[in-house]
Amino acid sequence: KWSENGDTIGFKYADHITAVRHDGYTLVSLANPWRRGSVLHRYALVPRTDSARVAGSLPEGATVVYTPVERSVVFTSPHCFLLGALGADKVVDGECDFGYINLPYVQRGVKAGAIADCGNSMSPSIERIVSLRPQAVLVSPFEGASYGQLDHIGVPLVECADYMETSALGRAEWMRFYGMLIGREREADSLFAVVERNYKETMRLAATSRLRPKVITERVVSGVWYCPGGKSSMGRLIADAGARYAFAADGHSGSLTLAPEKVVAEASDADCWLFIYNGGKAPLPADLLAEYQGYKMLKAFAGGGVYGCGSATGVPYFEEVSFRPDLLLMDFVRIFHPDLGLK
């Protein structure tokens, strides 16, 4: 019978995941980030070579995933990026939201027919997913999430709740779990060690600056300004870069839905304004004002402190930032601390 005894695999920064290695399998528990004290999902990762031996001793209620996963459907671009970074791009047999994925190997694979486009992640093609015979489907959960027909196709759903971590390193550390899934545990541990080292070195560099600029992010969309919560990984990353996030006092780890007037009232004195833009051309000041006249009240708008990243210009921002926060942190330090003379 299953025993609680086993060797705990330490996660240094991630708060919502634990893993215990038992004889013949590894039990991974994902905490529910929306209901404190409850479990989102448990997985028993079983090497195929041990499947017969441990068949009767696995914990009840755990979703069994036979490892290494060699065929998968991946719903999110950050996880497509990670699998590629771990040398496991061949594991991706299907993906969703192809039009938003800025990864050459995925684009080539879909065009060549080696990777299937399974449609919109909110309403994917179940028939196409089933036809791929995946050994796991990597999905992005949300509060109260239901996966409809996906729950009934007999394929393990791996709920990628890493985005609910409250620190950038905590989110990135989930790569170690994904490494366990695909038989790239050593590679994932090595990559995370690089990310951690770079991140900490950059934090120390930021601390030497005399500047502590105030920062806001994002733009108005359909009359709403969506900002990262004060306890989100992005909010924490801005702080780690030696800046003051305008909503740092907020206690949420997800996104804030704010009236534009509230953002302007709270952050009109922000020195830096950062946002992502779609399309290949950066918006001009006139374009921004056509979107929302209130932007002209921002100190950053008037003072040249506006920085945009074009997600459709060959820059894989959405793909990389989750698991390579060290790269984004360095970009932030370059922006926030011109006194350091970084290029």
Segments from the language model and where they lie:
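Ligand-binding cleft/hinge of the Venus flytrap
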Residues: 87-89, 102-112, 151, 235-248
